[in-house]
A protein has these predicted regions:
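Anion (oxyanion) recognition and catalysis
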Residues: 30, 110, 167, 194-195
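Histidine/acidic-residue-rich catalytic or RNA/ligand-binding cores of hydrolases
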Residues: 102, 122-136, 162-167, 184-193, ...
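His/Asp/Glu-enriched, well-ordered alpha-helical/loop segment
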Residues: 142-149, 191-280
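Short low-complexity, flexible loop/linker segments enriched in glycine and/or proline
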Residues: 15-18, 51-55, 129-131, 188-192, ...
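Metal-coordinating catalytic core of metallo-dependent amide/deamination hydrolases
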Residues: 11-156
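Active-site microenvironment of metallo-dependent hydrolases
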Residues: 221, 243-339
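Catalytic beta/alpha-barrel core
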Residues: 149-159, 175-181, 203
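Divalent metal-coordination and catalytic microenvironments
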Residues: 29, 89, 117, 152, ...
Length: 339
């Protein structure tokens, strides 16, 4: 799922094709074989008082009408990709979109997933409460028709009651534990959330580190640190590693509106295998394989990856890695040369 902020040219002027950068993301998805769920981000204001965007934000900015046009054009772009591609929508946050537009998001975009930042930082909670007389989760629950289409990103500043009520809507909590730790945003209440049948997904919001195993490890360790417990997310029949991996797979499938997460007829063949010949996994079986990968290994143990049956990683190396890395280095050199 690509939470896509950047839409316009420097200075905030739209490209001739308003969905030009969505087109670039589609091209990248095609080259890498990723099963793309594109989430164009609607970002209009710099705060709840509807102040203007800063110079660093104007390439994100769209009125609601222009955003609808962008979304429509981006949808056309995706028709050229494989059929496991889909599109949703992402009103950035309660601070960045007009209050009347927020209330209508579910009806204005009647299909596809909806992702939005919610209750990420203390400052956000206080700003929303000052302007709208309610905490972010309180306001969203009362005004936005939360249901299983929604994925709320971070959710690190929720009260116990908010955690329970939001979990019971069927919405997914989209967690980015490395970023939330790096920025000091707070700790998601994963124990209370899962006790109330809440679904969660894992994302890599970080520009510091991108690693699935490390995101899962950080999620679990954060629960232990907050509550002073061990194996806080394990269940009697599933180890910690299996519990959080399967939870992330199930919630991620829901958040991306993708028929995946099971090796069954009718589901996309999204699969990965781990290198069990590695010393990190040697001799491990069953749940111990996942536990060792998440808590003692890293993503170098990922050996093979299939996306909707497309075999994109073989023996730990992406099939197009050579040309992608070479192009990336050339682009970095060009950018540095232009500074």
């Amino acid at each position: 799922a690509e939470f896509h902020y950047l839409h316009h040219q420097p200075g905030g002027v739209p490209y001739d094709n308003i969905a030009e950068l969505s087109d670039r993301i589609a091209a990248a998805a095609s080259q890498t074989g990723i099963g793309l769920c594109l989430l164009p981000v609607h970002y209009e204001f710099g705060g709840c008082d509807q102040r203007a965007l800063t110079a660093g934000q104007i390439r994100f900015g769209n009125t609601f009408d222009r955003f609808e046009t962008l979304h429509s054009e981006a949808s056309k772009v995706l028709k050229h990709l494989p059929e496991d591609t889909n599109i949703g929508v992402a009103p950035h946050s309660l601070r960045a979109v007009g209050i009347d537009d927020l209330k209508q998001y579910g009806s204005n975009f009647p299909t596809g997933p909806i992702h939005m930042h919610l209750a990420e930082q203390v400052a956000e909670v206080e700003e929303v409460r000052a302007h709208w007389s309610a905490r972010p989760v309180e306001w969203a629950l009362e005004n936005m028709g939360m249901d299983a289409r929604w994925c709320l990103i971070h959710c690190t500043q929720m009260t116990s009651d908010e955690t329970i009520r939001l979990a019971q809507t069927g919405a997914v909590a989209g967690l980015c534990p490395i970023t939330e730790s790096s920025l000091g945003d707070g700790i998601f209440d994963g124990v209370r959330w899962t006790e109330n049948q809440g679904q969660f997904a894992i994302g890599s919001d970080s520009n510091i580190r991108i690693s699935l195993s490390e995101e899962l490890r950080t999620l679990d360790y954060s629960q232990r640190l907050r509550d002073g417990t061990r194996a806080a997310l394990a269940t009697p029949d599933r180890s910690t590693g299996r519990r959080i991996f399967e939870g992330a797979v199930q919630g991620g499938a829901q958040a991306a509106a993708r028929q995946t997460g099971k090796l069954e007829v009718g589901f996309w063949a999204d699969m990965m295998s781990l290198d069990t010949t590695s010393e990190h996994l040697w001799g491990r079986t069953h749940d111990a394989v996942l536990d060792s990968w998440i808590f003692a290994g890293n993503d170098s143990l990922v050996h093979e990856v299939w996306s909707a049956g497309r075999h994109m990683v073989k023996q730990g190396v992406h099939t197009a890695r050579g040309q992608i890395v070479a192009a990336y280095k050339r682009t970095l050199d060009d950018l540095k040369g232009a500074l």
